[in-house]
């Protein structure tokens, strides 16, 4: 027997920029093989990719903060006929916040604020074996091996943008602040592996009006991880969001690895 499925999800956000959408691709395949009356094999495989693309990792919470400090007397966008002093840098309208560099619309737009891209690739596999012992009716031996692999990639890109207050009387733009004052880019990779073997023996027998059930099993869980990250600031240009564009004078690196879970257990039940 076998079963195979494919899935796709495209979830739209409620922002006009559509920069908070979520996508997922997944596939699954299960195969059960009956060799004979005593031996059975099973193989279960699944893969899933989650894609999150937004202006920032914590953009949603910061958008509500910017909205709470914005004043309704200021326009949400600059007038189209305004002459931008520096067209090479994105420009947004002043929202009335005391810090001067806040704008909720800027935080919801990847073209203005920057980008945060996260890709999760998850693989799960299971191989099972079941054997009915001849000569001992009701005794079944079973062995399973489970494996889970997670590969996560995250990239964060920040670029400065100017926040202008518009003087309608003089048709002049006044610089109130700069969002993301320093351009930067960071890239991180995270990998995690979990191995879960299990063996069991089950004995079932009817004795008159009674049922006898005995179960003995042993299992082990091992999970290991590794991660590293790198960041550079003061990019030579914001048109190429890659690490090599940043200055080597302002770079940081980090990383770690090791086991975070290890467990063994045995169970017996009558």
Identify the function of each model-found stretch.
Residues 130-135:
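Long hydrophobic segments that form regular secondary structure
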Residues 8-12:
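Transmembrane beta-strand segments that form the barrel wall of outer-membrane beta-barrel proteins
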Residues 1, 13-20, 28-122, 142-143, ...:
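Surface-exposed loop/interface segments of Gram-negative outer-membrane beta-barrel transport/assembly proteins
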